[in-house]
A protein has these predicted regions:
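Helical scaffold of the NTase/Pol beta-like nucleotidyltransferase catalytic core
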Residues: 1-23
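Catalytic metal-binding acidic patch
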Residues: 26, 30-58, 85-87, 91
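Acidic-enriched, low-complexity/disordered segments with a strong bias for Aspartate over Glutamate
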Residues: 7, 38-40, 49, 103, ...
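Short linear sequence motifs
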Residues: 5, 21, 50, 54, ...
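Short secondary-structure boundary/capping segments within folded domains
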Residues: 13-15, 31-35, 79-80
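Conserved NTP-binding catalytic cores of kinases and kinase-like/nucleotidyltransferase enzymes
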Residues: 7-12, 25, 44-69, 76-77
Length: 129
């Protein structure tokens, strides 16, 4: 189920000029996910604030049962529970989130494991943790 979802997100991001990179973090990136795990995505975009304000992009991937916004410093997350049972956290960050030297929070998230889905600007190509 999540594989098709990730493919759909990648296609959307490839076609969307506002999206610079998409990565998976958390248990799916580490390969420790269980049937109850949510999918944690980080989306690098210079349009973070606009996407937080207008969350319609989340509707492109399925029918929504519930949606909430969560604030974590440089990352604003839109957590979505889809009617098909998937729970997805879209972490929206500005490109400065990946600026070197990485801040402590970014370093922790990435050190725990990440998987690049799309990297138009090659932010993750030579990233040293």
């Amino acid at each position: 189920m999540y594989e098709k979802f990730i493919d759909a997100v990648k296609q959307w991001a490839e076609e969307n000029g506002r999206i610079e990179s998409v990565i998976i973090v958390g248990s799916y990136a580490r390969g420790t996910n269980t049937v109850t795990s949510d999918l944690d995505l980080v989306i690098l975009t210079p349009c973070r604030d606009e996407m937080v304000e207008n969350q319609e992009f989340t509707e492109l991937f399925g029918k929504i049962a519930k949606r909430q916004t969560e604030y974590y410093g440089a990352c604003t997350s839109v957590r979505v529970w889809y009617q098909n049972g998937m729970e997805v956290e879209f972490g929206l960050v500005k490109p400065s989130w990946i600026s070197v030297p990485l801040d402590q929070g970014t370093h922790k998230v990435l050190s725990d494991g990440y998987k690049v889905i799309l990297d138009k600007k090659s932010y993750f190509l030579n990233l040293k943790l």
